[in-house]
A protein has these predicted regions:
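Solvent-exposed serine/threonine-rich low-complexity stretches and specific carbohydrate-binding patches
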Residues: 129-144
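Sec-dependent N-terminal signal peptides of Gram-positive bacterial secreted proteins and lipoproteins
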Residues: 4-27
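Histidine-/acidic-rich catalytic cores in large beta-rich domains
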Residues: 48-90, 94-126, 148-150, 154-565
């Protein structure tokens, strides 16, 4: 699977297809976002085979469509089935209860339950012929050692025979093992279990964790999937439409998008415990969401009423109470920036909202512990910090080139000053807020995928002269995007470019993620993601499978405290 070559050779070959990918990606996103949420997508239970791992009988529950998987009442019925099996058996290790993906939320996973005489911890190793081994330390409680062990094992290779070896270790270090065999179902989204891997010039180690691919459009069934460092798909979460945007963790819960209207919350065993529906409140989700300090979801949204009345899209933020499910709008950028809306009247022509009015196009939201939020506006190439989100929303600052806001009301007063001479971000995505204990109070970092794409359909007469060496949606050989990192100093009202890297060009979507000393970059329209070392040398690049393949984001999670200790 690995091929030694220079990574830029691949980049040159696939760069020419970016314009086609951009068009297909944007049009398919729009079509999918417009799908009727009530349309039933037929569900067929995939075949798993094993004498050691049981498949539940769902005939009395009625799982007939993927929508049924995200029905919390049906999920509760599944939990009752599992509880009945636990009560009916005597599962003292080495006797165990093993179920194939009982909650139907992770295609290749296995639910495992047993008890031990002594307090113990559990680790496991998964082996499959022709694939590297996968290891994990099971997380069944907050304690390191327990007598009751209930967890979801992930890391199985789809459609082939896997051997899982469970190792139970007591406090004295005594080990007992049990081996099971299991052939999981095939993936519902991809034909292949592997991604093509190309090693770069760096010999540095990759970070631990699983790459999580969001919004791969070249799939037979929409899903978010996990990829290990060797390019093996180790997990798959089927969804209804759109993409999952990101995984957000809170105690023993994980949140992810399942459609353009819904976010699901699952527990460590894979059970869907709640589904939050903004569609019933008159909104659609897009791009991103996060949690605030009270445990509420903050999500970027489109008002269905504003879209129907004014063709206006992607300029709202809603708060979702995770206890009650109540949806409340906390930001309307037309009300916040009326002078911009009077000026930026052009209609989208090439993106997923062609024919719509999209003067802000929010694509990232980050929550700051002081109660403020940082959002990214692609259309204005501006990063905005906003305060008083619960009351009267107010602007703290903008980060952009001053030319963006020159002559637009008094908004130029909010633009921070550049600390040195550099070109500001353009069409950015995946903006991330980072605190650092070595910095003074009022200082922090912001890093982003700087698309370097000059696209602003809402203001077709905009002067781009402040952005030399920038590119349009018409990708050509030699175009590039950037990873950009700023030091923001609110005390001085400045921002400074402290790190930058030229990366393969992507006019839209895309993500970056700092992981210790390493950097993960996903130029979405290129269909690749790459991990770099601290010197910005390529360690390894992964190519998504399929023709014209694109992705929305790729982040890497270690799943510690959720699946693993």
């Amino acid at each position: 699977m690995r091929k030694k070559s220079l990574i830029w050779t691949i980049i040159m070959l696939i760069g020419l297809s970016s314009i086609v990918c951009a068009y297909l990606f944007s049009q398919s996103l729009k079509a999918e976002a417009d799908q009727n949420e009530d349309k039933k997508t037929k569900f067929s239970l995939s075949v798993a085979t094993s004498k050691d791992v049981e498949v539940l009988d769902y005939s009395n529950i009625g799982i007939n469509a993927y929508q049924d998987i995200f029905n919390t009442a049906k999920q509760a019925q599944i939990a009752q089935l599992i509880a009945a099996k636990k009560a009916a058996g005597h599962y003292k290790f080495p006797q165990i209860l093993a179920l194939s993906n009982p909650y139907l939320t992770n295609t290749t996973s296995v639910y495992i339950y047993f008890e031990t005489e002594k307090v113990s911890k559990v680790s496991y190793q998964i082996s499959a012929a022709g694939y590297p081994d996968f290891v994990g330390e099971a997380n069944s409680s907050e304690n390191e050692y327990e007598t009751t062990h209930e967890f979801q094992a992930i890391g199985f290779v789809a459609g082939v025979k896997n051997t899982i070896t469970l190792t139970v270790t007591d406090k004295e270090g005594n080990e007992t093992t049990k081996t099971l065999t299991y052939t999981p179902p095939k993936l519902v989204s991809k034909d292949k279990n592997t991604l093509e891997v190309t090693d770069g010039t760096s010999e540095k180690a990759l970070t631990s964790g699983l790459y999580t691919v969001f919004g791969d459009k070249n799939v037979s069934q929409r899903a978010t999937y996990l990829v290990d460092n060797d390019g093996i798909i180790r997990g798959e979460y089927p969804i209804l439409s759109y993409n999952s945007m990101r995984f957000v963790f809170d105690e023993q819960s994980m949140y992810y998008g399942i459609s353009a209207e819904k976010i699901a919350r699952i527990n460590q065993l894979g059970q869907v415990e709640q589904v939050y529906d903004v569609g019933s409140a008159g909104y659609n989700l897009h791009h991103d969401f996060t949690l605030d300090k009270e445990g509420n979801l903050l999500a970027l949204a489109t008002s269905e009423e504003a879209e129907e009345k004014d063709n206006l899209v992607e300029d709202r933020i809603v708060q979702i109470n995770t206890k009650t499910g109540k949806v409340k709008q906390i930001a309307d950028f037309k009300a916040l920036l009326p002078d911009l809306y009077q000026l930026a009247t052009g209609i989208e022509t090439i993106t997923s909202y062609a024919g719509k009015w999209d003067p802000i196009h929010l694509n990232t939201i980050q929550y700051v512990e002081d109660g403020s939020i940082i959002v990214s506006s692609r259309e204005t190439s501006t990063i905005m910090k906003l305060s008083n989100i619960e009351d009267a929303l107010s602007i703290d600052y903008f980060i952009s080139d001053e030319s963006v806001w020159k002559g637009v009301g008094n908004y130029s007063n909010f633009v921070l000053e550049k600390e040195s001479d550099f070109v500001s971000q353009l069409g950015q995505h995946s903006v991330t807020y980072v605190e650092d204990a070595t910095l003074e109070e009022g200082q922090y970092y912001l890093y982003m995928f700087n698309n370097n794409s000059k696209i602003m359909d809402s203001r077709t007469n905009f002067d781009w002269s402040a952005y030399p060496d920038s590119f349009s949606d018409q990708s050509t050989d030699g175009d590039y995007s950037r990873y950009s990192k700023y030091l923001v100093d609110e005390n001085k009202g400045t921002y400074e470019l402290v790190d930058s890297l030229e990366v393969p060009y992507s006019a839209f979507v895309s993500s970056v993620q700092e992981m210790g000393d390493n950097l993960l970059v996903n130029p979405g329209l290129q269909g690749i993601f790459t991990e770099y070392d601290k010197n910005h040398q390529v360690i390894r690049t992964y190519q998504l499978s399929g023709n014209g393949v694109t992705s929305y984001r790729v982040y890497k999670y270690d799943f510690k405290g959720f699946y693993f200790k």
